[in-house]
Each structure stands twice: as structure tokens, then as C-alpha cells.
Curated annotation (Swiss-Prot):
The gene is UL49. Belongs to the herpesviridae UL49 family. It comes from the Viruses. One of its GO terms (cellular component) is viral tegument. The lineage of its organism: Viruses, Duplodnaviria, Heunggongvirae, Peploviricota, Herviviricetes. This is Protein UL49. GO terms for biological process: viral process.
Amino acid sequence: MANRRLRHAPHTATDEFHQALRRLFAPLCVHEDHFHVQLVIGRGALQPEEAAVETSQPPAQFAAQTSAVLQQQLVHHVPRSCVLHLFVTDKRFLNRELGDRLYQRFLREWLVCRQAEREAVTALFQRMVMTKPYFVFLAYVYSMDCLHTVAVRTMAFLRFERYDTDYLLRRLRLYPPERLHALLDGVTVSLLGDLHRFLFGVDLRLPVLHPTSSPCLALLRAKRFDARADLAVYHRNQWCHQRQPRSPQLRGLIAALRRHAGKVPCGNPLYVLARQAVQTFCDTCPRYLVPLRALGLHDETRGGGSTAAAAAVGHAGAGQQAHHVEPTKIVLFALSAALRGGLIGSVIDLPLWCLCRLKCERHLDARSLVAVVCRQCGHCLNLGKEKLHCQQNFPLNSMFYYRDRQEKSVIFNTHAELVHCSLCGSQRVVRQRVYELVSETLFGQRCVRVGWKAVLGLNAACAVYDHRLAFDVILPCAARTCDSTVVVRGVTVPRLLRLTSHGHGLLCARCQTGEYRDSCLESEDGAPLCRGCALVKQTACHVGGHIVQQARGGLAATSSSSSPHGLPHV
């Protein structure tokens, strides 16, 4: 069988196999610009045909709105095809078209390679002909070696630093011969997934940090950090239970709680209080540390976090290898809260390149340009019926929230006078201004902070880190005397940044009809200038007679259909 020959393979044969594999797959791989790292974290997971820029506009009109740098990128755009794209797990089946293209490119390298390289690749698994299933298997081995390189050099928390080619070949010797023979004869997603689980103990998932309904961060699932009532503490770089005896006051408190609680299934009130304290701390503190020890994303649960497992770690001898035991569930909840705060959101802060875009405060009030955002699920709740497209999203059954309601609005409880999110049921609903002008004092100097923001239709604001991804946003109207918003379709991050510079803003439907309103600069009533107009008066754009105009073509702008002002007044 295939792995009988593998059992007795010398170490030199393994080295020759590794070197030949790297040489043959190097032309099929993309190494520059940290492409493998981007693929692992989700930025490079798009297929080449999906990543290509498409436009239905005439070339002249499209070039008129595009900068010189972006025009050069579009003209000379070459889709980057990497062999790791073959194992992106966004579909249930391997990409046949991509596999055929890579297989044809590999055969060109295979026909011109040296005879020693052919023997090193085929003799280890007793293959006489380079078939497509065997090519896919070799591509999988090469991809695991690339993940090992990424983990060693850049992302050690992936726990792939010990999964090199030597480790993989050693584990293949223990794989059942009939299953390996079936895999080499015909590679399927099911067989490849079984092999990956046998080798590494986890499901095959690429990108590793992709927001899916079955999140790769298994230690962050709700059923994991909300199902046990342990009291493990972090002591001497390991997780163990408290060894010191309880004080009389603590014993009295526990006894009193037990007497009054009885057998009422009230859960764990102390844990609920601790969760609320951790959530508030993570929301209010800009920086904090979550003690995770050496746990990685691919570590399996050893002992299930039980008391016996935690005690075994605490009493492990110096010569005995201690197993990785999960930290206590409150620490896992803190990690989930930290990831939620860094990944989930629907409001994007934009830089303001010119002060001539400041609005006149005469036409703004406390309810103008306000977005109601849920801090728990990250969705904007006052979009109304506006449909905004975005490819990135954290689905409802992910690790962050668990309810299954599709509408996004605010529920007001008149009995208790509480506000709830209709999507996840959380009470952590906040108001964020899409445009604001705040006066501050820094180091004795009076300063003005300008906030210009964009609102997404989904809760994956981290999609802005992918400069090739197109999405829909809601922006404040570019007119200085308007408190309405516009919907911008199919915008990317480079094009979104140009919308905050002078002369490139989009106007709402009301301003496009020619409705004119005076600002403080045009008013003749002798009233003092507002803060925005006072700053605009000092800009070079105003002195030189600059007039804010609508951006030319390329971006479809429509007024929001939910209300006359895009985002409803709050």
C-alpha cells in the first residue's frame, strides 16, 4: 500500500521530497507582499476572477474619476493565482476550474524538471503517473508547509509552527493505508477533511480568521465559556485552582448565599456580575491584556476544563509534560469581548482632508446625523428599509450573539423604560454622530475635533482593511447647509477616502434640486459665525473662491429611502 513504503523511507528521501516539492510548486505560488499572511487572515481569500476589478462604465468616464495611481493598477492588473487558493473553504467542493489551471501549469514544470526530482516526488508514495488527485494531495502538503512558515515568522498563535513537512510525513505513517490509497486515487473535500483532522486535530479551514457560522476560534464559542462554573486562577504561568484556605468572611458569605438560594435554579449570579464588569471594562479601557498563556487557535481541550484537569496541571512534576488546559470561562468571555470590540462595528471614521467641508451649525441640531448602534452585535439600528451591500458579515449564529431575528430596529419597553436591540436583544445601544464638531483643550491649547463617519449596512466594519472589497455606505451630504445623508453604492476604501476632500463630495436629492440655504458666511443678519463657518472662512479654499461641487460619475448616490434625512432623527 501507499504508506507501507512511507514507513521505511529514510530521512534523506524525506529531505529530497521536501526540496523537490518546494521547487516544483514555487512557480504556482505567490510569495511577495506577505500574500500568505493576508490569505490566512482573510484579506487574500478572494479567487483571482473575483478579485479582478470590474466596471460597466465607459473607459473615459471611469478614468475621469480615478487617480493616476489607481488607473495604472487597473490597466496593469494581473490576477494573482496561488496554489493555496485551492483550499479556501468558502465552498463545499474544491474549485475545479482553478484546480485545472494549476494542474496544467504544474505539468509544464513537471515535464522540464530533473529525473531525480521526479523520483523523489513519486517514489515516496509509490506513484508512477502524476495524476490530478496526486497533484492536489501534493499541493495540500505544500500548503501546510507554507502555513508552517507563516506561523514561525509572523503569526505564532496559529500553532502551525510544529506542523512542518517532517511532522506531516511522520503522521502519515500512522494513517490507515486504505484511506490514504483512496485519497490519492480521488481527492474530495470529505477525504481531505478527514486527513486534516487526523493530522492536526482540527477542521480544514482557510482563511483561519474568516467570520463563518462555525467560527474557527473554538475556544470562544458561547457553549464553551458559559457552561461551567469553575474558579480557576492564573498563578505562576499556569492555570490552577486556589490552594489557600478560604477566609471566615468568605465562607460565611458562601453559606449565606446557599441558605437563601436553596435549590432555586437561578444560575450563577456572581458570574453574571463578573461578566458585566468585564464587559464594561473592555468597553471603557482603550488598552488591556487578557491572560491567555500559550494557548493557540488550534489547541484542543485537554480535560474539558474540569477541576481534575486543572489540578493535574498544578501538581505536574518538573519532568512531566503538562497538558494545555483552558483558562477559566470568565477569561474566555473577556477574550470574546476583546475580539468583538475590535472586529464588530458598522461605523467607520474617515479623515477630513480639507476644512472647507465643515458644516454650518445653524442648520444642525441635536438629532441631526445620528446613528443608533448596538454595541453587542455592531449593527446600525436606524437604517430603516435601506439595503446596503457588503460581502463581509458576522452571521447571527456566530460566537458573538445568538438570536435569529432579521429586522434591525430599536425596541422601547414602556413598562421598564428600557431600550433593546431587536436583533440581539442587548441593552447596550448607543448614539454615534455621523458628523460632529467638538471643542477640546489639549495641553492648554484650544482645539476642534472633526468627526466625519460612514455607516455600513452590516456589522463587519473590519472589511475596510481589504482595499479591493466593494461595499455600500451612508455618508453625510457634502453641502455645508444640509443635515441629510446620501447612499454611495459600490465604493472601495481608496475611493471612499477621496470623498472627504474638497470638491469630491456627493449631494443628496434635496440639494441636487437646487434648494438654497444661507450659511453664516452668506447671512446678512449680523449674527456671529458658528465654529464651522469661522474655520471655513480662514481656509485657502474659501479665500480662493472654491465652491464645493458634486463628484463626477462612477459612484451611484441616492438619498436614503428610510427618511428624508437618510438616517432617521433620534
